[in-house]
Amino acid sequence: MESLLCRRRIKRVMVLIIALTWLRSTCGELEDQLFEVGKLKMFVDDLPDMPRLYGFNSVHGIIKPASLQIGMFSTKWKFHRDLPATPVFAYGTSRSKATVPGPTIETVYGVDTYVTWRNHLPKSHILPWDPTISPATPKHGGIPTVVHLHGGIHEPTSDGNADAWFTAGFRETGPKWTKTTLHYENKQQPGNMWYHDHAMGLTRVNLLAGLVGAYILRHHAVESPFQLPTGDEFDRPLIIFDRSFRKDGSIYMNATGNNPSIHPQWQPEYFGDVIIVNGKAWPRLNVRRRKYRFRIINASNARFFKFFFSNGLDFIVVGSDSAYLSKPVMTKSILLSPSEIVDVVVDFYKSPSRTVVLANDAPYPYPSGDPVNEENGKVMKFIINNESEDDTCTIPKKLINYPNADVSNAVLTRYISMYEYVSNSDEPTHLLVNGLPYEAPVTETPKSGTTEVWEVINLTEDNHPLHIHLGLFKVVEQTALLAAGLEEFKECMTKQNDAVKCQISKYARGKKTAVTAHERGWKNVFKMMPGHVTRILVRFSYIHTNASYPFDPTQEPGYVYHCHILDHEDNMMMRPLKVII
């Protein structure tokens, strides 16, 4: 541990001189270079439906595996009618077809999809990045990238390990890189996923630049009886994120860190003042008086959304993250953290008005930050056709019954602790899981096919969305740490990182917060409340069958788990996960 920290300090000293020199050339940027967000009129751009790519072939009516070639390109994108075109990094089958977000990949249960992800990015990044947080740093320049299919259950070599990065033309590759083509088995439960960059220390800037896209796994035999809305018009992914812009249209990211003598550029959270849906700022969508299905993905770096409709219309939740619920849940609002997915049906026939705004009222940072304003409190507008029509879609009483969260089946209990460290000025410097940097030897070694209880102890003031690669989990309970003696417990944990020795049972006796009804299904991300212990039941096997994985989950480079606030993930809030047999 000591030697790891020493190596980090040496590297920091070496790169600090370079970073500070670069900062001198950028820190003179004036506020008047920023685009005045109030000048952008809302609801003037139509909601795009992103291009579709199909991860399967149909030959004489028989569905067969397919291979896709998807590139990452430097291009320009119009986020708003009145905003100059923005330099971005975008996924697509060619530069001219690249989009932000990238194309939606449609796949079929049980049919393999092979994707060769190709890096066509330039030598230099379009955004500032911080060399002191140990990012992937190629010797010959270029922008490291690697794609992670978020929510996917597949072999480690196709998981998009942060150290499996590569530069343009595969000229340079990271220490964990193994192959050019990734294999997605598509043998898990049907549901929603998304793909995004996952390069070490660069995830936050690569996603800000535009490297995100939706991925849908369909199982027609299972899903058809539900009679949910189908077809491109009525079944739409909505990828939502926030950005700020300069007057020239370029993405604005603060180039000065909150602790510039430690991290010249890194800041604990990025928040933009413009809300983007499918690549357009506050778009509009003309809808008919009938049911629509929206697969909503929060692709923000750090912003939580608490969605609601301005006229009180209901959400009917049918899925959470990559799995269906056991039955639909009706709700007036939905809290979605970065990287979470919610699958909803909205019945516009029941709308009392001709127009309705999808709005947001989540403070930022969540939960105790600033309240929303006029700009980030609105997401998009729906304009409803006044003519009624026959709607054959239904809301089924039941969906898919997966196994319950039976804690008695767990083979062991692990304690996972979240820490934030601050400077003398009380500004965050870095965040750790279990008090360990990412490079420290693996400590979580679940056995394939088993279930574990994880007691996640959040000792910070932020809500951290915990994402576990490969595993699926159910949230069992959320218990507040007692305020009396909390500082004593934090001090003990900071020194020892041993929940049992620090008498967790003595402090985890506060108020219990019920798990929201639409979040009681199987998830791969969940919001860890500050000052709470959240018990989750993690399953390292399929939930829809007792069959074993069709791949070897013990291969290198293994998997990871981490906070999905990207600015935290990039600054050490990630740990390796090694599955054993």
UniProtKB/Swiss-Prot annotation:
Spell out the coiled coil positions from the record: none
- Localized where? Endoplasmic reticulum membrane
User: Which UniProt keywords are listed?
Assistant: Copper, Endoplasmic reticulum, Glycoprotein, Membrane, Metal-binding, Oxidoreductase, Signal
Q: Which residues bind Cu cation 4?
A: 464, 563, 568, 573
Q: How is the cofactor bound?
A: Binds 4 Cu cations per monomer. The Cu cations are bound as 3 distinct Cu centers known as type 1 or blue, type 2 or normal, and type 3 or coupled binuclear.
Cofactor(s) of this protein: Cu cation
This protein's superkingdom? Answer: Eukaryota
A GO CC annotation given for this chain:
endoplasmic reticulum
Q: What happens when the gene is disrupted?
A: No visible phenotype under normal growth conditions, but mutant plants have reduced inhibition of primary root growth in low inorganic phosphate conditions.
List residues of the Plastocyanin-like domain.
283-352
Q: Which GO terms describe its molecular function?
A: copper ion binding; oxidoreductase activity, acting on diphenols and related substances as donors, oxygen as acceptor
| Keyword field contains Protein transport | no
Q: Which GO biological process annotations does it have?
A: cellular response to phosphate starvation; meristem maintenance
- List of residues binding Cu cation 3: 198, 469, 562
What does the record give as EC number? 1.-.-.-
Note the InterPro entries from the entry: Cu-oxidase_2nd (IPR001117), Cu-oxidase_C (IPR011706), Cupredoxin (IPR008972), LPR1/LPR2 (IPR052152)
Q: Which residues form the signal peptide?
A: 1-28
Q: Where is this chain glycosylated?
A: 254, 298, 386, 458, 546
* Primary localization: endoplasmic reticulum
The entry marks the following residues as binding Cu cation 2, namely 150, 196, 564
Query: How is the protein disposed in the membrane?
Result: Peripheral membrane protein
- UniProt function note: Multicopper oxidase that may be involved in copper homeostasis and oxidative stress response, and that is necessary for root growth inhibition by low phosphate conditions. Functions together with LPR2 and PDR2 in a common pathway that adjusts root meristem activity to phosphate availability. Oxidizes the substrate 2,2'-azinobis-(3-ethylbenzthiazoline-6-sulphonate) in vitro.
Which family, according to the similarity comment? Answer: Belongs to the multicopper oxidase family.
- State the name under which the record lists this protein: Multicopper oxidase LPR1
Q: Which gene encodes it?
A: LPR1
